[in-house]
Amino acid sequence: MDIRAPEQQYNPYRVYTREQWARLRDDTPMTLEPGEFDRLRSLHDRLDLQEVEDIYLPLSRLLSIYVDAMQRLYYAERQFLNIRDRKMPYIIGVAGSVAVGKSTTARVLQALLARWSPRPKVDLITTDGFLYPNAVLDRQGIMQKKGFPESYDLPLLLGFLSDIKAGRRHVRAPVYSHLTYDIVPNQWVEIDQPDILIVEGVNVLQTGKLPRDGKAVPVVSDFFDFSVYIDADEAALRRWYIKRFLALRDTAFTNPKSYFNRYALLSDEEATATAIAIWERTNLANLEDNILPTRPRATLILKKGPDHVVESVALRRL
């Protein structure tokens, strides 16, 4: 007789403490140099040798198992169907709230995975490039909802992922500038048949409304082979966002070309009040309505504590 609580019996995830997860590293070698951490770390995120050893090396080992299994299945299916397709990349999605540390996780994974043997080609793309230009958002009256699902050019993003998954070459994605807070006209980044593609964005696990006529309506996560959701309590996210806003006020916002240059001369009190207002009006609403509900769709959940350190890991059961 199973005497576990119902929420444990029916939990689709296996949950590991940090210590339990760290032991799963086994003999996975450390391939990053200490000097690389600053380059991989986002502003005010936490990344050190211990975090990589305890969290990211076990994850790298797990992903190597998943990628190898998918490749063997892919080749077996091709043999069964007697077809010769182009190379199909393995796509990993990284999701989570603003200020949670998605970019750091994505960059660390890219660095670790690219040093597997043999050396795979690992590319990284963010969904920021698929936001509508500011002029379009203004025209549609949704500039205050930038980052919400409706602010993305979903057909363009789905077309991009479809081309990548089909193994097409020289697939282009738009470029986004965090300085101007807008799409850069006539600039593109090219993705050319990677072995692994990491796709990072707040809403990459978002689902659409189910059609009444039964027709297939693709969503971004349909193209993912593995997905990571980075989780943290709202109070921590709010604090990290405010801290980041204050740091940007003293750095990037001082650039006259910055979209947020008007905030550069705010006092600490004014900047904090502004950051709280932006958080509550935009980021918190997006988190509660659109981002957090997608957490149960992830393959793996990294739960961070108040100091940006991962405290537990939840892995979806096969």
UniProtKB/Swiss-Prot annotation:
Keyword Cell membrane attributed: no
Gene Ontology CC terms, in alphabetical order: cytoplasm
GO molecular function, a single term: ATP binding
Catalytic activity: (R)-pantothenate + ATP = (R)-4'-phosphopantothenate + ADP + H(+)
Primary subcellular site in the record, as a coarse category: cytoplasm
Pathway involvement of the protein, from the record: Cofactor biosynthesis; coenzyme A biosynthesis; CoA from (R)-pantothenate: step 1/5
EC number: 2.7.1.33
Pfam families in the record: PRK (PF00485)
Gene Ontology terms: biological process: coenzyme A biosynthetic process
Keywords: ATP-binding, Coenzyme A biosynthesis, Cytoplasm, Kinase, Nucleotide-binding, Transferase
Stretch forming the signal peptide: none
Annotated ATP binding sites: G96, S97, V98, A99, V100, G101, K102, S103
NCBIfam families: panK_bact
Family label: Belongs to the prokaryotic pantothenate kinase family.
The protein's name: Pantothenate kinase
Natural source organism: Bradyrhizobium diazoefficiens (strain JCM 10833 / BCRC 13528 / IAM 13628 / NBRC 14792 / USDA 110)
